[in-house]
Curated annotation (Swiss-Prot):
Function in brief: Transfers and isomerizes the ribose moiety from AdoMet to the 7-aminomethyl group of 7-deazaguanine (preQ1-tRNA) to give epoxyqueuosine (oQ-tRNA).
Keywords of the record: Cytoplasm, Queuosine biosynthesis, S-adenosyl-L-methionine, Transferase
Catalytic activity from the UniProt record: 7-aminomethyl-7-carbaguanosine(34) in tRNA + S-adenosyl-L-methionine = epoxyqueuosine(34) in tRNA + adenine + L-methionine + 2 H(+)
Transmembrane segments: none
Keyword S-adenosyl-L-methionine attributed: yes
Protein's UniProt name: S-adenosylmethionine:tRNA ribosyltransferase-isomerase
Family, per entry: Belongs to the QueA family.
Species of origin: Chlorobaculum tepidum (strain ATCC 49652 / DSM 12025 / NBRC 103806 / TLS) (Chlorobium tepidum)
InterPro entries (alphabetical): QueA, QueA_dom1, QueA_dom2, QueA_sf
Length: 340
């Protein structure tokens, strides 16, 4: 199986460029791996797919102001996207435009210098007056995905954020949860479904394409995550009682599956903090999650491959084509699927 096997035609008009008028009013395709069935539902009815004793695991990372516009002395516009808000990488940014080592940029009266270009589309920057992350915090905007082909607007500050976002650190939202509302979470809880929160700060890999044709040649980015002891215990108790661990998105999936050896070794009694660099593609054996909520992903993306690993590629692509035929909206602001 090659990366090109995960290519498909995604018409531009199927990409959701804006969120729905009302949070939670999107559609939902339901996949049953055991029967191969594909049914159509609504995201607002997600609670009907869950069972008493299940555990819904959410990513409570909060999207930071990671997008900043700078200019060269010539006036040329350079778009910068802060990659990670960590000490060791806080001066790395994706950029759009032409840059060379030694270039000077100006952003809101602050001079930036291009110290290095470590890889294609990534610049290492220094800030003349202090911390680069502080500059982004003060003057940056919400980093909506580049494929939306528009600047962030006021509505994105609220809608490109989950209702339970808490800990700042992501440069992209955990989009599978964007349509979860307080009302829907109350219905899920009332049904006897547990809820646990983990943190994974979404970083670099969300925006970088796979450039190799072979899975083995692709190097995944690292993303910090934390699974609190309370969440670990809930996962262990759910597993022991026969309930399903339902991952709200690929970010939760990466955190839980990367942490699987430590969680299992500790008997689900210990907190786990690490950096996930796990690349999940068909052939991977899942150790923690039993069901997955996720969006419709871009062709040739690592998240599409993760979803195919969980759902089986043939069933997943059949669902994708059915979604396209039925007018579903794709990518971050689009519709979703529930895979059990």
């Amino acid at each position: 199986m090659k990366v090109s096997d995960f290519d498909y035609a995604l018409p531009e008009e199927r990409i959701a460029c804006y969120p729905p008028a009302k949070r939670g009013s999107t559609r939902l395709i339901v996949l049953n791996r055991a029967t191969g069935s594909i049914t159509h539902s609504a995201y607002a009815s997600l609670h009907e797919e869950l069972r008493p004793g299940d555990l819904l695991v959410l990513n409570n990372s909060r999207v930071i102001r990671a997008r900043l516009i700078a200019h060269k002395p010539t006036g040329a516009r350079i778009e910068l996207m802060l990659l990670e808000k960590h000490e060791e990488a806080q001066n790395l940014a994706l950029y759009r435009g032409r840059l060379r080592i030694g270039d000077r940029l100006l952003a809101h009266g602050v001079e930036l210098s291009v110290e290095a270009l470590p890889s294609d589309g990534i610049a290492r920057l220094s800030c003349a007056t202090g911390n680069l992350a502080d500059l982004f915090d003060a003057h940056g905007s919400v980093p909506i995905p580049p494929y939306l082909k528009r600047d962030a607007e006021e509505l994105d500050r609220e809608r490109y954020q989950t209702v339970f976002a808490e800990l700042p650190g992501s440069v992209a939202a955990p989009t599978a949860s964007l349509n979860l509302t307080d009302e829907l979470l109350d219905k899920i809880n009332a049904k006897g479904v547990g809820i646990a929160h983990v943190t994974l700060h979404v970083g670099l890999g969300t925006f970088l394409p796979i450039r190799s044709e072979r899975f083995e040649e692709h190097v995944m980015h690292r993303e910090f995550y934390n699974i609190p002891q309370t969440a670990a215990r809930k996962i262990g108790e759910t597993k022991a009682s026969g309930g399903r661990v339902v991952a709200a998105g690929t970010t939760v999936t990466r955190a839980l599956e990367h942490a699987a050896p430590k969680l299992i070794e500790s008997g689900f009694t210990q907190e786990v903090s690490s950096e996930a660099d796990i690349f999940i593609y068909p052939g991977y054996e899942f150790r923690i999650i039993d069901a997955l909520i996720t969006n419709f992903h871009a062709p040739r993306s690592t998240v599409l491959m993760l979803t195919a690993a969980f759902a089986e590629k043939e069933l997943l692509m059949r669902a994708y084509h059915e979604a396209l035929d039925n007018g579903y909206r794709f990518l971050s602001y689009g519709d979703s699927m529930f895979i059990s």
